[in-house]
Swiss-Prot record:
This is Cysteine--tRNA ligase. It comes from Brucella abortus (strain 2308). Keywords: Aminoacyl-tRNA synthetase, ATP-binding, Cytoplasm, Ligase, Metal-binding, Nucleotide-binding, Protein biosynthesis, Zinc. It catalyses: tRNA(Cys) + L-cysteine + ATP = L-cysteinyl-tRNA(Cys) + AMP + diphosphate. The keyword Zinc applies. Transmembrane segments: none annotated. ATP binds at residue 305. Binds 1 zinc ion per subunit. Monomer. It comes from the Bacteria.
Length: 506
C-alpha cells in the first residue's frame, strides 16, 4: 500500500464495528457481491449495491493495484421467477429454450444498464448454471458431515445440527437465536423438514422444469436452492484459483476478504451462505468482512408496483435529462443520465437508507455539468494515474464516505484544481472521457459563451446578495438572461450555502 494512502477501514456487519482492512493476501484481494436474478429489468434499488461495490472495487484497485484485486459478482439464472417469466413470455417454445431466452436477454439488458451507470465490469461474473458440479460436491460434503440430510428427493441444511458441532454458530451474522429468527422469518412449511428452520440445498424438478443430476444419491433430476449457488460460485472463483476449496484443509485458504450485498440479504441469504461454506470448508468465517448497503425509497415511500413508483434503471436512462435536449445518440444519453444517477446515489452514505427523488437527480446532473465544463475549459486529459486524488481517496478509505469524497470534489471545483477534480471523479467512477473531449455533445455546445466570465459575474451577484443589494443582484441576473444565460439558484443540502448554476437558453 502506498505510504500516501490512508488505512482503509470498513464497517463489518459480522462484528458491528468499523475495522482496519487487512487482506488475507495483499497480492490477491478478493471480493464477492450477490448479483441479479435475471428475470426482469433491474430496478434502481438493484443499482445501489452495484454502484457501492464498484466504488469499493475501484478503491481496492487504487490501493493494491488493479492486477491484485478479484471481484466476483454472480448471475442467478436458475430460479422459480425465471421459470414463471419464461412460461408467460414464451408459451409456444420448449421450456428450456424459453428460459434461455429470458435469462440471456435480461442479462444483456442488465449489463448495458449498469455500464451506463459508470460501473466497471467485475473481474468475473459466474452464472449459476455453470457451477452445478461445485454445488453438488458441496452438498455431498455437507451430508457427509451430518449438517444436511435427504428427505423426499430434497436435500436440506440443518442449522440445529450445525450449532451442535464445534465451530461457528448459525445466527452469528444476524445476531439472533434460532427462535428469534424463526419468529421473524417467512419459512416454507414442509412435512419432510426435520425442523422449521431447515432450508433447501437441492430440490426435485417438476416435469418440464429445468433439471440436473442430483447429489446425495438422489435419482431424480433437480435444481439447487438459492443459497448454495453463491457458496459454490464464490468457492469456484475466489478460493479454488488460490489454493482453497473442498480439497483444501487449510481454513485460511478457504476464506476470502469481502462479501457484499443489500441489507435485505443479511438473513436468510447471507446467514445461510456462511453456514454452508463454513461447514463444508472447515473454516470459522466464509469472508472476513461483510458489507451491506441500506434500503432505497422513492420520493419518501417504499418502492412498489402497487404504489406506481416502481422505477427501473432503464426508466431512469430512457427519461434522459434536459441538458442533452434532442440528442439522438442513445448510448450518450444513457451514459449522461447514468452518471447523474450515480452521483445522486453517492450523496448518501452506503449504509444509510436513501431517498431517490427526481429533484436530486436533476441537481446531480447540473453539478456534473459544472464539473465537466471546468474540465473541458482547462483541457483535462484522461489520467493514467490518480496521483492527485488523495482527498477523495482519504474520504473513501473511511468506510466509503462518499459524501466526504463529493465534498472534496466540490472544493476542488471551487478552487479550480482541475487535476484533483478530474482524478477524484475518475476514482469514484464519475469521469467519462467522452464528455471531456467530444466536440459534438449539445450539453457543452457553448462556443460563444465565456464560462469564466459568467463565473465571475455569478460571484459578483453572490456578493450583492450577501450584502442584501437585491437590485444589483437582479440586474446581473437579468443581463445574463438577455445574453441567453439563465441562472438557477439552489442550496447545498449539507451546508445550506447558496449554489448558482447556469445554462444556455433561447
Amino acid at each position: 500500500m502506498p505510504d500516501t494512502t490512508p488505512q482503509l477501514r470498513l464497517y463489518n456487519t459480522l462484528t458491528r464495528t468499523k475495522e482496519a482492512f487487512a487482506p488475507i493476501d495483499a497480492k490477491n484481494v478478493r471480493m464477492y457481491v450477490c448479483g441479479p436474478t435475471v428475470y426482469d429489468f433491474a430496478h434502481i434499488g438493484n443499482a445501489r449495491p452495484v454502484i457501492v461495490f464498484d466504488v469499493l472495487f475501484r478503491l481496492l484497485r487504487h490501493v493494491y493495484g488493479a492486477q491484485h484485486v478479484t471481484y466476483a459478482r454472480n448471475i442467478t439464472d436458475v430460479d422459480d421467477k425465471i421459470n414463471a417469466r419464461a412460461a408467460r413470455d414464451y408459451p409456444d417454445l420448449p421450456f428450456n429454450e424459453a428460459i434461455r431466452k429470458v435469462t440471456e436477454s435480461t442479462n444483456a439488458q442488465f449489463q448495458a444498464d449498469v455500464t451506463a451507470l459508470g460501473n466497471l465490469q467485475p473481474t468475473v461474473q459466474p452464472r449459476a448454471t455453470e457451477h452445478m458440479d461445485e454445488m453438488r460436491a458441496m452438498i455431498d460434503r455437507l451430508v457427509q458431515r451430518g449438517v444436511a440430510y435427504v428427505a423426499q428427493d430434497h436435500v436440506l441444511f440443518s442449522p440445529s445440527a450445525m450449532n451442535a458441532r464445534k465451530g461457528p454458530r448459525y445466527g452469528a451474522l444476524a445476531r439472533r437465536s434460532l427462535d428469534e429468527m424463526l419468529a421473524g422469518a417467512r419459512v416454507d412449511v414442509a412435512s419432510y423438514k426435520r425442523d422449521e428452520m431447515d432450508f433447501v440445498l437441492w430440490k426435485p424438478s417438476k416435469k418440464g422444469e429445468p433439471g440436473w443430476p442430483s447429489p446425495a444419491g438422489i435419482e431424480t433430476l433437480g435444481r439447487p436452492g438459492w443459497h448454495i449457488e453463491c457458496s459454490a460460485m464464490s468457492m469456484a472463483k475466489l478460493l479454488e484459483p488460490f489454493g482453497g476449496g473442498l480439497k483444501c484443509d487449510d481454513p485460511e485458504r478457504n476464506q476470502f476478504d469481502i462479501h457484499g450485498g443489500g441489507i435485505d440479504l443479511v438473513f436468510p441469504h447471507h446467514e445461510n451462505e456462511i453456514a454452508q461454506s463454513c461447514c463444508a470448508l472447515g473454516t470459522e468465517r466464509m469472508a472476513n468482512i461483510w458489507m451491506h448497503n441500506g434500503f432505497l425509497q422513492v420520493e419518501g415511500q417504499k418502492m412498489s408496483k402497487s404504489l406506481g413508483n416502481f422505477i427501473t434503471i432503464r426508466d431512469v436512462l430512457n427519461d434522459g435529462l434536459p441538458q442533452l435536449g434532442e440528442w439522438g445518440d442513445n448510448t450518450v444519453r444513457d451514459h449522461w443520465a447514468g452518471l447523474a444517477a450515480r452521483l445522486s446515489m453517492l450523496q448518501t452514505h452506503y449504509r444509510e437508507p436513501i431517498n431517490w427523488t427526481a429533484q436530486r437527480l436533476a441537481e446531480s446532473a447540473d453539478e456534473l455539468h459544472r464539473w465537466y465544463g471546468l474540465l473541458r475549459d482547462e483541457g483535462f486529459g484522461a489520467p493514467e494515474k490518480l496521483s492527485h486524488a488523495s482527498a477523495v481517496a482519504a474520504a473513501l478509505c473511511d468506510d466509503l464516505n462518499s459524501w466526504a469524497a463529493i465534498t472534496a470534489l466540490r472544493q476542488a471545483f471551487k478552487v479550480r484544481d482541475v487535476a484533483a477534480l478530474g482524478e477524484g471523479m475518475a476514482l469514484m467512477g464519475l469521469l467519462d472521457p467522452y464528455f471531456v473531449t467530444a466536440s459534438d455533445v449539445p450539453i457543452f455546445a457553448r462556443a460563444d459563451v465565456d464560462a469564466s466570465a459568467i463565473a465571475a459575474r455569478i460571484a459578483e451577484r453572490l456578493n450583492f446578495i450577501n450584502a442584501k443589494n437585491w437590485a444589483e443582484a437582479d440586474r446581473i441576473r437579468d443581463e445574463l438572461l438577455q445574453e441567453g444565460v439563465q441562472l438557477k439558484d439552489s442550496k447545498d443540502p449539507a451546508t445550506g450555502e447558496r449554489i448558482t448554476t447556469w445554462d444556455v437558453v433561447g
